[in-house]
């Protein structure tokens, strides 16, 4: 059993671990199917005349939990398929570009999956979905002269009040990748604090909290206070062809590339044992280690949740765990 996953377990989205069978319809479908009500009037943001937040009431959470489960499975499998696809290019022993880019996207998908398991979703609400949401809000007389726009939203479910709260990405938070990493960083900081706030804090809880804080510190490296360091490194490789990742591989020896490719299986290790803070090995190595930690954390949480279904029929066993087993053969 993973200590990291066990300590995080109390902070799962309540009820998610009990979702059974194959989950196939995500939040986008949930919005369109209209299993919710609207009792809160729309209000403009404090900085513009647009609506940046809306609240939906959820009388029956089962369909919403299935939507979370579906998105978690989809993103988890995308992460593991991406990391599994990394291979060296024959005849180019110093090439590391696709190693870095694929590791980034695997961690990006994994971060999304982790957030879903904690009850948070960074979701793109398109025009069709926003139209349906506005239709429901109109029916309940809560439009107040406004409309929910399309865009990227941070959505979270409050099971105590049975409310699904969505807040739109603001322009100063960058694109969808920056929005994801900002949200992930905020939720990881919050998780670390919650762990230390548990009654009778033990040494193992302190260890897990400290490791999560290390992750957050690394995500804020090199002038990225909102947690977007991984995205900034990805941009250097993907858009600027920097860090010696592409031909002519300036500053990268075959030995250096060999060491970077040794991280291909690092995500299969216990995340607590993956080093995060060392800067001596340079940005690419630290970048890969951080990505591996996030993917490992997602894997450990998925495996832990899959074993907690009351009837041993976890949606994970029909999705991500089944996919991991397929990769092992």
Segments (PLM) and residue ranges:
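Terminal alpha-helical segments
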Residues: 1-329
């Amino acid at each position: 059993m993973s200590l990291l996953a066990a300590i995080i377990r109390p902070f799962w989205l309540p009820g998610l671990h009990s979702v059974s069978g194959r989950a196939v319809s995500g939040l986008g479908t949930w919005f369109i199917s209209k299993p919710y009500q609207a009792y809160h009037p729309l209000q403009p943001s404090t900085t513009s005349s647009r609506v940046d937040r809306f609240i939906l009431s959820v009388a029956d959470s089962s369909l919403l939990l299935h939507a979370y489960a579906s998105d978690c499975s989809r993103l988890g499998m995308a992460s593991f398929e991406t990391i599994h696809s990394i291979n060296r290019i024959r005849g180019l022993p110093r090439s590391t570009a696709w190693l870095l880019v694929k590791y980034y996207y695997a961690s990006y998908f994994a971060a999304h999956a982790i957030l879903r398991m904690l009850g948070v979703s960074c979701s793109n609400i398109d025009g069709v979905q926003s139209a349906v949401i506005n239709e429901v809000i109109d029916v309940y007389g809560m439009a107040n002269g406004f409309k929910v726009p399309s865009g990227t939203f941070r959505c979270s479910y409050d099971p105590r009040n049975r409310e699904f709260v969505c807040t739109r990405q603001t322009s100063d938070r960058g694109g969808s990748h920056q929005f994801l990493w900002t949200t992930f960083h905020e939720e990881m900081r919050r998780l670390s604090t919650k762990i230390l706030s548990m009654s009778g804090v033990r040494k193992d809880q302190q260890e897990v909290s400290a490791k999560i804080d290390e992750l957050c510190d690394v995500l804020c490296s090199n002038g990225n206070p909102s947690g977007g360091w991984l995205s900034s490194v990805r941009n250097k490789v993907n858009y600027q062809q920097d860090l010696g990742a592409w031909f002519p591989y300036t500053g990268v020896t075959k030995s250096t590339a060999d060491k970077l490719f040794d991280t291909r299986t690092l995500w299969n290790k216990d995340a607590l044992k993956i080093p995060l803070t060392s800067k001596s090995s340079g940005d690419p190595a630290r970048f890969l280690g951080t990505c591996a930690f996030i993917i490992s954390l997602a894997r450990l949480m998925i495996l832990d949740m899959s074993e907690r279904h009351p009837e041993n029929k976890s949606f994970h066993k029909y999705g991500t765990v089944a996919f991991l087993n397929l990769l092992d053969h």
